[in-house]
């Protein structure tokens, strides 16, 4: 799957379970870690877990499994699909860590151009 196909499938799956504030961050010019981050919120720990599970199910059907999964019971689940990384967070964690502002304020890396 291409990055854009993964991105579309991940955001669609998150939206199906009513994830809130789904944001896509294009980090290609800022990091070699991934091309995109998808950040979304769940209303409870169970909602966060359900969103992450739905994404994993949809991606598995397409033969794409995460390289790594972190925080399955912590209110912040991270699924690393290589070029696309999903962050599903409770609002409290999202406000505290503010990944969107962190990555948007970061300057492009000239070595990645």
What are the functions of these language-model segments?
Residues 1-33, 43-79, 84, 91-95, ...:
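Polybasic/polar functional segments that serve as interface/processing modules
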